[in-house]
Amino acid sequence: MAAETAQTSAPSTWRLGRLTVPLSIWLPLVIFALTRLYGFVVIALAARHQVALPSPAHPGIYQFAAHPSSPGYLGLITNWDGQWYERIATLGYHLPAVGDPHGKDALWAFAFPPLFPTVIGAMMTVTGLSFAVCVTVVNLLAGAAAMVVMFALIERTAGRFAAGTAVLFTSCFVAAPLFQAAYSEAIALLLVCTVLLLIARRRYCWAVVAVILLSLTRLVTPPLAIVVLVHAVVRYRGRTEDPIRRSEMVGMAVLGVVSLASVTLWSTITKVITSGVKATGADRGSVSNAVIVGRFGWFTNAYEHIGWIGVVGVALLVVLFVVVAISPVTRTWGVEVRTWFAIYPIFLLFVAGVHAGVFRYFLLAFPLALLLVGSPEREDIPRKRAIFVVAASVISLALQVPWVSHALVVTALAGKPWLP
């Protein structure tokens, strides 16, 4: 065993003049900065192959601001959903006038929750900077903060090695370039990690605020209700040694209800704004709408393409996530991280279809990275596992090249492009 592990040797602090920065801050920031620099190079090189947009070869791709061919880094990061966010940041949400030829676009914009484009739009107004520059600043700041919070969340129970692994692999994940593109993933990850950390620290009222903000960013709050439930059960079981105050009971109950119900917050607001206009896209991708139309994500896709064998296979995946979550492999992760590890991918299996865009959904499934290391002792760095983590991260970085080239870039090649 001694030959396989080594004591941590990284400096616990980093001095910048008179400022002392702890490892829990500088390490995730350095990892995020270096990987985003790599992402800049990958995106900038891939931009050379982008066609001019809008393009008659791709009539189904919405384009708010026309781009020339080879638009450069700042042009490429605003592709796809970024065009809808640019529209909202520039024009806001509004109802179309009667006879407006672009009326469907105005209504479809309601499909995108408001927090991310509102922040970008406010920055554009205050600074006068372009949409792409504001996106870069906001997402890099949000992504960096997300990594610091993620590190703190995991380090508290699993130690620095596990926390560093989660930050490293998440930053190197195949879809991680979206942390610097015009997508809401960076803010969403920051809010998810913040909610989990606040629950772990029993700051339930602040967690409610973070959940509401998350519901206005991405429709992923229902799994957090399960996290709150499991957290409450664990606290109830240990109430003899750790009594639960009445205010904490109320806080957990409110947090659970808000987590479950807030997934409909934006669609409810939209219905009020549109006053019954049926053409709005606000329910696109929502949990309730998926159930109403009889779509159950991977289960439906598996049945349509493989039959009941496929459904059974997806069901076994659900069981596998639960089994791993309660196994010794995850024993040091903390109940909140263990629960999110299982319930968020299960949530995706039920509500997200099988398509190339699923890679970006898994950016929020950051505990999956911990499977690379399991639950080592807090103060140890298992050498073999460390090598495995580095190798997996390098491979993932390499895979970013084809992913960006095929998913983020719109090329002149025939056929339907991948979706980021």
Placement of each model-derived feature along the sequence:
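Signature aromatic-anchored transmembrane alpha helix within multi-pass, membrane-resident enzymes
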Residues: 253-260, 378-411, 418-419
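Membrane-lumen/periplasm interface segments of specific transmembrane helices
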Residues: 35-56, 214, 221-342, 399-407
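Transmembrane-helix motifs of polytopic, lipid-linked glycan transferases
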Residues: 120-125, 134-157, 322-324
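Start-transfer (signal-anchor) and selected internal transmembrane alpha helices
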Residues: 1-66, 251-255, 385-391
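Membrane-interface transmembrane helices that cradle and orient dolichyl/undecaprenyl
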Residues: 158, 195-206, 376
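Short hydrophobic/aromatic helix or loop-helix immediately within or flanking a transmembrane segment
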Residues: 76-98, 102-128
